[in-house]
UniProtKB/Swiss-Prot annotation:
It comes from the Bacteria. Keywords: ATP-binding, Cell cycle, Cell division, Cell shape, Cell wall biogenesis/degradation, Cytoplasm, Ligase, Magnesium, Nucleotide-binding, Peptidoglycan synthesis. GO terms for molecular function: ATP binding; magnesium ion binding; UDP-N-acetylmuramoylalanyl-D-glutamate-2,6-diaminopimelate ligase activity. This is UDP-N-acetylmuramoyl-L-alanyl-D-glutamate--2,6-diaminopimelate ligase. Pathway: Cell wall biogenesis; peptidoglycan biosynthesis. The keyword Cell membrane does not apply. GO terms for cellular component: cytoplasm. Belongs to the MurCDEF family. MurE subfamily. UDP-N-acetyl-alpha-D-muramoyl-L-alanyl-D-glutamate binds at L27, S29, H44, Q45, A46, N157, T158, T159, S185, Q191, R193. One of its GO terms (biological process) is peptidoglycan biosynthetic process.
Amino acid sequence: MADRNLRDLLAPWVPDAPSRALREMTLDSRVAAAGDLFVAVVGHQADGRRYIPQAIAQGVAAIIAEAKDEATDGEIREMHGVPVIYLSQLNERLSALAGRFYHEPSDNLRLVGVTGTNGKTTTTQLLAQWSQLLGETSAVMGTVGNGLLGKVIPTENTTGSAVDVQHELAGLVDQGATFCAMEVSSHGLVQHRVAALKFPASVFTNLSRDHLDYHGDMEHYEAAKWLLYSEHHCGQAIINADDEVGRRWLAKLPDAVAVSMEDHINPNCHGRWLKATEVNYHDSGATIRFSSSWGDGEIESHLMGAFNVSNLLLALATLLALGYPLADLLKTAARLQPVCGRMEVFTAPGKPTVVVDYAHTPDALEKALQAARLHCAGKLWCVFGCGGDRDKGKRPLMGAIAEEFADVAVVTDDNPRTEEPRAIINDILAGMLDAGHAKVMEGRAEAVTCAVMQAKENDVVLVAGKGHEDYQIVGNQRLDYSDRVTVARLLGGIA
């Protein structure tokens, strides 16, 4: 571990900061240890300055604290022999501080940011897989977890704290990573968690209703996503031109790469572009023909559904924009694998096809059902619910979508959290024209079992909402549960 010193860390902001050797950087006083730097920020739920005495008692070497209402910017105090340096707007500066602390890890690998409501996980995984096939040592950071490909460790949030993000990136650099695809959430952008990162390329997948319990309305949600392009080192922008928001952004980003599978591109109006010219769906995926600023080609994809064609094209355009040769990308495309819990297909002789997907927004559920329909000769079943203590407005919308696009809707629990499961189900049913035709079953494992056992061999059962997750939150408890494991057991362990 390279030497870290408080004076060097704060040189751009506080030239007269004292010299102190530093071990680690933390926002959590509970894990602060001897020699650490404790950073006391004012958060949405707690004021970290209240925990300064605890951090001092645990032997920290120094403290950086929010100056607002306490001190002037750059003011230095001492508490029990521990220097406390106050900085104003500490949340906004935290990413830069952590970047200096961890020796600017985003300078030492090729970092691609991916934002949007749906498709972030699949697109980042495709970017990491594809770049590794071309010789990079690739990593991912996001919803499924952080780590080198094949060594991903689960995480709580899509985008961690500003300190966590820089720390994770530094760890990946230490492990030899040369390429990292990172999901960038709207929360992470608004809360400045990636403010000091340098992205040679940034991808926008789409925008639809989600997180309105946090952002309030779609205008603020869109504004949060736009921060990646307006306030960050986003490098080359790659934008989905099939999305209405994407088309608005392309008008503001003349150097962006436009990507489309719905003929929303006029090559004369965009600097660089990539578009599908023909897509044929089959049992094992899709055959995609495309044209682009870099040339034309054909790809055999093992991913299910139209939206995954879009995700793959976005990944392809990004790697082309970064300079990877088209010929090499085409040679390796057939080796790309589906992503865990993202339109993941489970089959067994004599049983229905079961698809497990993370779709938990109205738009994602509609697209997942449309994708499953392309591969369904019989009835299409949909097992889903909605999370408790989250945006209630999307529940009836998802009910209406399940009723319209599935032949059989099975409404059940997702993560009810502290809400009554039946109340959530009732909110979903309120969006259906004929709720009496829906099957209602509160226990999720029981609902999945019911659907899989009742469905016929040529039916498809979409189990939506949890994807890769291996837990269910009921009340304040985090219980062991996995749709993937449940389905695999029902099909005799064959996936």
